[in-house]
């Protein structure tokens, strides 16, 4: 039965999640060199438009309409045909259109996360085409497998409350693959890349934290106790990760940094995303405290071993954070909190949820790697992915967009 309170709540949560993509633009934009800030923020802006058009035309239908082999949907809701004001099959107290809009914001933020790995060296048109194809090949199937009716990963007993697999692991792994393919930025081994605008970084992180309440609490799909539970676990995990990252910096560097604190709060949110509506409140303390050292030292190790240039650590934050979050859900999940989970977690004496979580993570990684390689192969048929050395040296703001984030005016502007 339709519920006005649930509908209002979900519309607000949808707007919250939308707010995350501009927040990501500020977060990433502040981290890059000033000659690439327009390009970095423009990538998020372009995805905001592209994702809405693709989702409403065919993305939603492929992710949530019908079922083919537990992997993909069909075209029954092409251009939202048959999607109206009445409740749909996935939420019985809100209009079907509201559910579509809420999920659309997930389809927006997810590919935007990838852009942090390739800043300063990928052609804008190549990135645009890559994101379009990636959404089709990776995101829509992942959304169906986890959340769609008859989805394969849901069938094996895996749970993902708000997008550990669908959003963070898929985008993080894809970001790493793309970064390895593109190669390092010019002078990467010699130069020290400075964060050009620290206030932007903190502003973006704060916008992300604000929007994440809609992201996680809204995944309850109604204004109830589960939404409140997800709200609190998200707050706690983020806060603990922030403080733990600061502590690591104090121990290793002698002083905390605002960039580090901002990074910590974001990875705390990443880690709690899959389990926000499944784990007890006390477990969110553990999840948040542990994700910071896990991500901090994994990033250092990976950069030493792989020599990869994941510029803004998209894999280190979202890939590793999402993997830990998925495993933690298998450790601490409880059916008494959310009956969508078929079994309790490993710490409560049942190994089945934990095994399902590990299997789903492995499958997600495989889908992301293979899908990203396919996307790269298709895009390179039409355009080189990497900019020319001269364009990279000048900066992508000027070479790709003809704009400067901080112009120097002579006379009146």
Feature names for model-found ranges:
Residues 1-413:
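Glycine- and aromatic-enriched membrane alpha-helices
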């Amino acid at each position: 039965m339709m519920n006005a309170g649930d509908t209002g709540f979900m519309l607000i949560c949808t707007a919250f999640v939308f707010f995350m993509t501009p927040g990501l633009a500020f977060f990433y934009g502040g981290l890059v060199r000033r000659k690439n800030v327009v390009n970095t923020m423009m990538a998020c802006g372009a995805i905001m438009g592209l994702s809405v058009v693709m989702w409403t035309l065919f993305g939603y239908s492929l992710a949530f309409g019908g079922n083919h082999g537990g992997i993909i949907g069909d075209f029954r809701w092409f251009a939202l045909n048959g999607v109206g004001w009445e409740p749909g099959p996935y939420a019985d107290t809100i209009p079907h259109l509201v559910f579509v809009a809420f999920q659309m914001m997930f389809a927006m933020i997810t590919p935007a996360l990838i852009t942090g790995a390739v800043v300063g060296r990928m052609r804008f048109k190549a990135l645009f085409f890559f994101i379009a194809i990636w959404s089709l090949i990776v995101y829509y199937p992942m959304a169906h497998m986890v959340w769609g009716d008859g989805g394969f990963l849901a069938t094996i007993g895996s749970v993902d409350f708000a997008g550990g697999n669908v959003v963070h692991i898929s985008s993080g792994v894809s970001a790493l693959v793309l970064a390895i393919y593109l190669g390092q930025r010019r002078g990467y081994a010699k130069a020290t890349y400075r964060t050009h605008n620290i206030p932007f970084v903190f502003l973006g992180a704060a916008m992300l934290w604000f929007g994440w309440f809609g992201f996680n609490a809204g995944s309850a799909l109604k204004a109830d106790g589960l939404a409140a539970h997800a709200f609190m676990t998200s707050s706690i995990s983020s806060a603990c990760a922030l403080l733990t990252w600061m502590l690591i910096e104090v121990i290793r560097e002698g002083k905390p940094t605002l960039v580090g604190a901002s990074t910590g709060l974001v990875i705390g949110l990443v880690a709690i995303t899959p389990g926000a509506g499944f784990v007890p409140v006390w477990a969110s303390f553990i999840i948040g405290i542990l994700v910071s050292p896990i991500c901090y030292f994994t990033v250092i190790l990976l950069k030493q071993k792989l020599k990869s240039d994941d510029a803004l650590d998209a894999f280190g934050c979202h890939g590793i954070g999402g993997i830990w979050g998925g495993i933690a859900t298998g450790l601490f999940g409880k059916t008494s909190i959310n009956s969508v989970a078929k079994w309790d977690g490993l710490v409560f004496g049942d190994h089945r949820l934990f095994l399902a979580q590990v299997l789903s993570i492995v499958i997600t990684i495989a889908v992301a790697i293979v899908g990203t390689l396919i996307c790269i192969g298709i895009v390179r048929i039409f355009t080189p992915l990497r900019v020319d050395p001269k364009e990279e040296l000048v900066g992508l703001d000027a070479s790709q967009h003809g704009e400067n984030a901080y112009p120097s005016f002579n006379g009146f502007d």
